[in-house]
Amino acid sequence: VVGGDECNINEHRSLVAIF
């Protein structure tokens, strides 16, 4: 994902929310 740590954190939170 292009964007940086913030983007990575956002995706990680979304994955955690889904699971």
Curated annotation (Swiss-Prot):
<keyword id="KW-0800">Toxin</keyword>
<protein>
    <recommendedName>
        <fullName>Thrombin-like enzyme TL-BJ 2</fullName>
        <ecNumber>3.4.21.-</ecNumber>
    </recommendedName>
</protein>
<keyword id="KW-0964">Secreted</keyword>
<dbReference type="GO" id="GO:0005576">
    <property type="term" value="C:extracellular region"/>
</dbReference>
<comment type="function">
    <text>Thrombin-like snake venom serine protease. Causes the specific clotting of fibrinogen (FGA) with release of fibrinopeptide A. The aberrant fibrinogen is then incapable of being cross-linked, forming easily dispersible clots.</text>
</comment>
<comment type="subunit">
    <text>Monomer.</text>
</comment>
<keyword id="KW-1204">Blood coagulation cascade activating toxin</keyword>
<keyword id="KW-0325">Glycoprotein</keyword>
<dbReference type="GO" id="GO:0090729">
    <property type="term" value="F:toxin activity"/>
</dbReference>
<keyword id="KW-0720">Serine protease</keyword>
<keyword id="KW-0378">Hydrolase</keyword>
<dbReference type="GO" id="GO:0008236">
    <property type="term" value="F:serine-type peptidase activity"/>
</dbReference>
<comment type="similarity">
    <text>Belongs to the peptidase S1 family. Snake venom subfamily.</text>
</comment>
<dbReference type="GO" id="GO:0006508">
    <property type="term" value="P:proteolysis"/>
</dbReference>
<keyword id="KW-0645">Protease</keyword>
<keyword id="KW-1199">Hemostasis impairing toxin</keyword>
<feature type="domain" description="Peptidase S1">
    <location>
        <begin position="1"/>
        <end position="19"/>
    </location>
</feature>
